[in-house]
Amino acid sequence: MRIRNRIAIWAVAVGNLLTLVPSAHAIPAFARKYGLPCSACHEAWPMLNNFGQTFKDNGYQLGNERDAPIYQEPSYWPVMFRVTPMWHRETNERQAVDAVPGSATSGLVESTFNKSGFDLGGVDMITAGTLYKNISFFVQPFIGNNSITLAQAWARFDNLAGSRWLNVKMGKFELDEPISQERSLTLNNTGGLYYTYLFTPPGDNNFFGGIGFPQLGVELLGHSANDYRRYSIAAVSSNNGTPGLPTNQTFDVYANFNQAFEAPWFGRQQIGVYGYFGQSPTFFQTANGNPIPGTGMGNRSFYRVGAYGIWYVNKFDIYTFYTHGYDNVFLGNSVPANQPAKLPLGAAGPVWNGGFVEVHYNPNPRWIALGRYELNRMSREANPSTPGNSGNFDTWTVGYRYYPIMSPRAGLAWLQEYSRILNAGQAPISGKNGIHDSLLLGFDFDF
């Protein structure tokens, strides 16, 4: 069995009752450091405004005497904790269950399955800032209910040769995504992820899990003085951000370019393009039949490319995202490249298109409402015998956040969200659409 860690949309939908996975962050430590309110950097935390994005792109620096840690008060501690106590309800409308509970021989039937209760998604910790002027860092451990992981850890050299266009980062980091997964406003199980960032067709054996995962590598990035023009080019190990060199010895390349401009009557707008180009092994060297980590062979190519826009109209902002994906025929059919005879007749590399539209209504800094529609459509299946809609999905998400507290010391949001996902043909017995719903109410606070 291959060593891998990826999310196929049908597996997410079946498994989304098990865990709360999104992780996003605002960092009140920066507000304490500079004496600024959270709203200086956040349109609605954890979502950044243009000033916050510029501050982040500058390596968490304002360009004044407070940037270097040697000028900070000894009592300043650049650490943030984020916790989300909640109540949530999860529904699977076509769960396979025994016809007679406890009887494995009674046969399986589809039934609606519900569970609900109070829960805790874990504790997000972040320490970030500057080690010295123009040397930035970021470390993000996550304490889950059953594990502790290091979500991100990187160091960055800023303004090389005195130019804001030359910055270098190394470590495990979030890719410069078109719209940040880490800063998503939604936390519920069904609508808390941008699935088009993570999609892999059913039956595909690509080790790459999607641009939504932090990756291990090095990044060259830069921006204009007002942050209206930005670029990022990253070379990352082909291991989906997993430490320990578990796959092969190749590298993937990710690039993102965007440009903002002023539109009459509406102000700042932003457009961009991105691409991820990589290779994934199709088999491993073995010992007694067991794969040896790091010995991946038979590499085959894949890519994800797309375009996006962020549009502002009065108190509304609208995120639009489009993606086009392709995996090699061996990856799509989970066939080792050294055994081409195992490919089914008429096999091809899977191709798909997806995207989402997300709308925010932000009448004031303490309140924001949102709605999102996301979809994916397969345009070519890897195996011609596979139903043409296998891998298609539609997701609807609505919610709001109210912020009674937003200070340089802490922030708290009351949130309510509802999301519904339809996975075409994924019902385990009838082959109908798999349907999952998630309702979440809770507090999201950091300090």
Predicted feature residues:
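Short Fe-S-cluster ligation motifs
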Residues: 64-84
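Sequence/structural segment immediately N-terminal to covalent heme-attachment motifs in c-type
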Residues: 27-37
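Outer membrane beta-barrel
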Residues: 49, 79-91, 95-99, 111-241, ...
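Cleavable N-terminal signal peptides
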Residues: 12-14, 24
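Outer-membrane beta-barrel pore domains
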Residues: 154-157, 161, 265-447
